[in-house]
Swiss-Prot record:
Was identified as a high-confidence drug target. This is Putative 4-hydroxy-4-methyl-2-oxoglutarate aldolase. Its cofactor is a divalent metal cation. The lineage of its organism: Bacteria, Bacillati, Actinomycetota, Actinomycetes, Mycobacteriales. It comes from Mycobacterium tuberculosis (strain ATCC 25618 / H37Rv). PANTHER family: 4-HYDROXY-4-METHYL-2-OXOGLUTARATE ALDOLASE 3-RELATED. Substrate binds at residues 78-81, 100. Divalent metal cation. GO terms for biological process: regulation of RNA metabolic process.
Amino acid sequence: MAISFRPTADLVDDIGPDVRSCDLQFRQFGGRSQFAGPISTVRCFQDNALLKSVLSQPSAGGVLVIDGAGSLHTALVGDVIAELARSTGWTGLIVHGAVRDAAALRGIDIGIKALGTNPRKSTKTGAGERDVEITLGGVTFVPGDIAYSDDDGIIVV
């Protein structure tokens, strides 16, 4: 389900003080600086096999929220996984952890927000959980809710 993008500041003005605005300060990495879509989630720690499996499945404009426990020790997403996500219809990735291939990510037509970078690869054992509620920056990301992301931040409705 493709969602029309709305600026996060406009959503805050419309929703008011009860808005679900993520307090974490993510950096932009992908070729799109704004994106919106229904949320899917993966929780994994320094292992990206499960998220690669999820991103291999077609999406109609979804946003994958990846809880990597904030680890900057290894990258969960690089250019290969980002291109896979773009090719299967995902519109955005929110990574509570690190990415790599930062220069290449800027050229891929997908939104990517992450805490930072590390060139080190993650493991690939498949450990983790999917479609679970994830709380980041005071906001709970619930599968099926809608995430809006731009240069001002991330809103969940």
